[in-house]
């Protein structure tokens, strides 16, 4: 049974009104910027500085994902969680999880785009100025 453990993040974000604004993956970090509802000038940055496995999906398939039992610990409109025994975590490479032990599953929920991250390090959170999203020629 998936167990959700809410993570306290400041500023508190109403996940229903937020969305993933930008995701960048470099050789040494994964950076995810989320919309802070009501603040057009800043974003909430979630940063992982180690090897990770990620999954990005819409909120609808996440809610309809086949789990054996109800989800324990979900808080209405909450944004960030540490999750145990969810399908995303249990179906990943055992070798990767062994070499990255202890790997923890983090889930960031918005009203549109959700982000799952499997990581051996905790994420850091910071409020940053919004910048124009890069485009490619």
Where are the regions that the model predicts?
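Surface-exposed, interaction-prone regions used to assemble/regulate multi-protein complexes
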Residues: 1-137
